């Protein structure tokens, strides 16, 4: 990796392994504007906002695609460069739907932010672009081509991180668009609803489908009892919108906020995750006893399940039959509230607050609809709940603490870490290992299941059997691992797959954050695990009691599902 010294705006700045000049500039504390640059994606260099001026040659080049060289002298904010950036912004705005006040991304739109930053107050160019139909067919995202600035971020994240290639460029010149192949609607593609395209989109061209109106209607309906479950990853991210550091657990404040908003009962999805851990562990041990099929894949991530259905259905027999924690809670609520609804004449309306856009798709799956109603009536993302709190004028950081309601508000530390990569696999290992000591917990924590590496591999011994485990981030990496398995190059007993970087903490429904922000959220969940009253699912007294009351047959009916192509 290159090392050296360069001059940026007259200041000496060292570099040591940075992959481009842009990284060195940002290291120097200069916030260089970009639309199309993400450090985890390939360099595209299309937006030209990050251009710098070479003091020696006078040339203007994109800093994202320049390698740093020893002795290089550049300027980042000359009069020439500022004019260049303003013209780019004017051209983008000229062909952009500028209904900013009603845009879903207003306040978070990067184009809006940079236009304000660079003082673009008028647009001198005429808009000659056509107007295109909005695509609202996806259960998770909405695509508005009229707000697209052709940065290519969605194209690259879909191809490079997920290996799906759902979106790409079509046509040329002023007719250029980003769209699915053959101008299909999103619902006509093999999109898995991960929503990462919306997470990286700098404008309102792709946004998470907003269902806030449905939530308010339910809350204000006196004939409805609104019950909410909160996923683990939400508690360490929702506070970011209120000045609370990423990773700080604000679950008890969020419970207070939801009660102020008019929600009747608030529960914790970790309760369902403990059910999942026990059921999935029992299934895994049964497979070990019967010799497979292996690998057993985790089933918590609905985008991963959808990917297997679309791309590799032969592996559906390998996926765990356990429902996700969200859907386990949904099934239990459906069972527990049926009699109560009949007695008091109200209808229980079940909302799940999730970090994940694919959960919107999962809730609508026919496997989870009974008697014409879904087990989870509505899924709201962390973003949507933030918007609802802000609409109410609630300042989360100033609220008192209130614990989730019982009996469905109690979860283990193992359940909390479901929200970060490696958490599901670690929870299963904790349950399956016969050694339940604190020392065993410490050893499990350093097995290699944690961290953001694309593919993590480790071994653990249970009884006389050495088990091979893998944890995967991103569907593109999952595809690579499946290829190795197909070709006989790899064998595993258990594989956890999470579609989003870092696991659920990096879900597309979370506040927009850098990679370091996602890491802090994951660290926050591990800290909550460390502080938990009990660390293993089988130590949850309510879950253990309920499973005993239900019995094996009823548990299987409520907690398991099969996926068929």
What does each of the following model-derived ranges do?
Residues 5, 12, 16-73, 77-83, ...:
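Iron-sulfur-associated redox domains of electron-transfer enzymes in respiratory
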Residues 5-8, 97, 130, 139-141, ...:
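A short, structure-level motif marking secondary-structure boundaries and short turns
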Residues 10-12, 101, 134, 187, ...:
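A generic secondary-structure micro-motif detector
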Residues 48-193, 199, 206-218, 224-225:
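Fe-S ferredoxin-like electron-transfer domains
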């Amino acid at each position: 990796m290159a090392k050296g010294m360069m001059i940026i705006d007259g200041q000496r700045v060292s570099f040591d392994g940075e992959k481009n000049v842009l990284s060195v500039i940002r290291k120097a504390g200069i916030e260089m504007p970009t639309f199309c640059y993400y450090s985890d994606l390939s360099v595209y260099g299309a937006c030209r906002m990050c251009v710098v001026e070479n003091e020696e040659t006078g040339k203007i080049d994109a800093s994202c695609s320049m390698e740093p060289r020893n002795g290089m002298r550049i300027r980042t904010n000359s009069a020439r460069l500022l004019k260049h950036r303003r013209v780019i912004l004017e051209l983008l705005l000229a062909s952009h739907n500028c209904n900013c006040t009603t845009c879903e991304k207003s306040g978070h739109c990067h184009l809006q932010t940079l236009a304000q930053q660079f003082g673009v107050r008028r647009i001198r160019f005429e808009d000659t672009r056509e107007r295109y139909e909005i695509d609202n067919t996806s259960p998770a995202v909405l695509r508005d081509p009229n707000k697209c600035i052709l940065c290519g971020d969605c194209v690259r994240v879909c191809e490079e991180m997920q290996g799906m290639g759902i979106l790409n460029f079509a046509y040329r010149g002023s007719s250029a668009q980003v769209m699915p192949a053959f101008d299909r609607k999103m619902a006509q593609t093999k999109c898995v609803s991960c929503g990462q395209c919306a997470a990286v989109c700098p404008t309102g061209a792709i946004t998470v489908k907003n269902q806030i109106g449905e939530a308010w209607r339910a809350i204000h309906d006196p004939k409805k009892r609104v019950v909410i479950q909160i996923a683990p990853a939400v508690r360490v991210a929702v506070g970011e919108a209120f000045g609370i550091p990423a990773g700080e657990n604000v679950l008890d404040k969020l419970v207070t906020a939801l009660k102020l908003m008019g929600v009747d009962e608030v529960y914790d999805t970790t309760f369902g995750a403990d059910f999942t851990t026990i059921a999935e562990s029992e299934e895994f041990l049964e497979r070990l006893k019967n010799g497979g099929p292996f690998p057993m894949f985790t089933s918590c991530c609905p985008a991963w399940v959808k990917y297997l259905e679309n791309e590799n259905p032969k592996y559906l027999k390998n996926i765990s039959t356990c429902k996700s924690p969200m859907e386990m809670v949904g099934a239990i609520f459906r069972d527990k509230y049926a009699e109560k609804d009949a007695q008091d004449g109200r209808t229980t309306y079940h909302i799940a607050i999730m970090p994940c856009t694919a959960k919107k798709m999962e809730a609508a799956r026919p496997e989870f609809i009974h008697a014409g109603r879904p087990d989870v009536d509505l899924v709201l993302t962390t973003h949507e709940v933030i918007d609802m709190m802000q609409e109410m004028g609630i300042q989360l950081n100033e609220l008192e603490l209130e614990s989730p309601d019982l009996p469905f508000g109690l979860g283990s530390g193992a359940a909390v870490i479901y929200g970060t990569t490696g958490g599901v696999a670690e929870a299963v290992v904790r349950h399956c290992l016969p050694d339940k000591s604190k020392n065993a917990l410490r050893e499990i924590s350093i097995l290699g299941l944690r961290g953001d590496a694309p593919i993590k591999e480790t071994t653990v011994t249970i009884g006389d059997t050495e088990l091979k485990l893998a944890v995967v981030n991103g569907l593109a990496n999952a595809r690579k691992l499946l290829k190795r398995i197909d070709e006989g190059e790899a064998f595993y007993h258990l594989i956890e797959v999470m579609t989003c970087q870092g696991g659920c903490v990096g879900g597309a429904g979370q506040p927009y954050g850098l990679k370091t922000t996602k890491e802090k959220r994951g660290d926050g969940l591990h800290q909550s695990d460390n502080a938990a009253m009990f660390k293993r699912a089988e130590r949850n007294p309510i879950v253990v009691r309920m499973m005993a009351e239900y019995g094996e047959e009823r548990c299987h009916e409520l907690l398991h599902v099969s996926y068929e192509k």
